[in-house]
């Protein structure tokens, strides 16, 4: 089994557990408490996604140049309870590399929608990197949208 398949298989029990939950602030707190950066699940998935970046199967499609990439690791399937798995890479070390109408120095992903919500596992590659979630800025851990 390759690392991509290992990531998918490791995700399925987690997806089974969260399939009937509603993304929001309560779920974000729950995820960070139960599956935060010191949990086995977080450690396994973050290790596999980092390997995916190295092997070139995770976040390998440029959206706005090499500093903003993503890839669909898995389309929704019955096996994953109709969740998809997507990897996103954002390098905001040089905010001038990203144009914003409001001249804000915060990197934003392209607009996209999720009718049933979104769970984001935040895997910083650099110390101090964060993603804004419902509870504010989040380093290693989870956000919901």
Model feature map: region roles:
Residues 61-109:
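A short glycine-rich, His/Asp/Glu-containing loop-to-beta-strand
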Residues 110-130:
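Short, conserved beta-strand element in jelly-roll/cupin
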Residues 55, 59, 68, 142-144:
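Polar low-complexity intrinsically disordered regions enriched in Ser/Thr and small residues
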Residues 1-58:
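N-terminal leader/capping segments at the start of a protein or of a new domain
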Residues 87, 120-122, 139-142:
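Conserved hydrophobic/aromatic beta-strand scaffold that supports enzyme active sites
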Residues 51, 62-64, 115:
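Generic alpha-helical scaffold signal
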Residues 128-145:
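Short acidic-glycine-tyrosine-enriched beta hairpin
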